[in-house]
């Protein structure tokens, strides 16, 4: 797979922005300092489809000859790891309803089963259940299917709806990923 370079464009579509913001009021991951005592700040990890920064603690930053980004996390009996705070993809333009209406034939995944990413090649394959979409309408439930693609292709074919809700530490609006393979009954 390709090597990701900071500042390179073409990782996502130009309208994709991904943020890590430890300062969201009442956010589940909000905090003033990371696990190493470094003051935290809002970071646009991806803006306009371009990779801007990594998430790093002191150790990972040193290995890459970068500065820490204030993303150290602590757990009992282990050295500091790396984690996000309130991590989210910003809203897109289309409403959820308009996104569904735009799909001639598709699959709305509401449950993913197992782990299926090859981190060397970027190949992605996962069991799923959800709803079939035909001519812009959700028609019926589907289970025991597999969805597959490649992460590079998925990122480039990803569009976000405008229905972002903050419920967890990691949040995203509904996303449409075009040109994935769907297999099953």
What is each model feature region?
Residues 2-185:
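Dual-mode signal for accessory low-complexity, basic/Gly-rich regions
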